[in-house]
Amino acid sequence: MTFPKISDVTNLDSSSLAEEILVIKRELFDLRLKRATRQDFQPHLFKHSKHRLAQLLTVEKSRTKSTM
């Protein structure tokens, strides 16, 4: 599984961007919960989810800065 490209994120509108951020945060929470309860999980998904979240937050921040 490869990392998602930032060009995919820049094409999203503001509402879907905010929705995607919530989805990724929920995925990270679920992964942490699985790790804490010693359930089966794929550790590489932490890195992928964090990378995706960083991309989403970067685009969101740049959009809010550009409107100021």
From Swiss-Prot:
SUPFAM superfamilies found in the cross-reference section: Ribosomal protein L29 (L29p) (SSF46561)
Cellular-component GO terms for this entry: chloroplast; cytosolic large ribosomal subunit
One GO MF term: structural constituent of ribosome
Chain coiled-coil ranges: none
Source domain of life: Eukaryota
Gene Ontology annotations of biological process type: translation
Subcellular location(s) of the protein: Plastid, Chloroplast
Protein name: Large ribosomal subunit protein uL29c
Gene3D superfamilies: 1.10.287.310
Subcellular location, principal: plastid
Lineage of origin: Eukaryota, Rhodophyta, Bangiophyceae, Bangiales, Bangiaceae
Keyword entries, A-Z: Chloroplast, Plastid, Ribonucleoprotein, Ribosomal protein
InterPro entries (UniProt xref): Ribosomal_protein_uL29, Ribosomal_uL29, Ribosomal_uL29_CS, Ribosomal_uL29_sf
Family, per entry: Belongs to the universal ribosomal protein uL29 family.
PANTHER family (UniProt xref): 60S RIBOSOMAL PROTEIN L35/50S RIBOSOMAL PROTEIN L29, LARGE RIBOSOMAL SUBUNIT PROTEIN UL29C
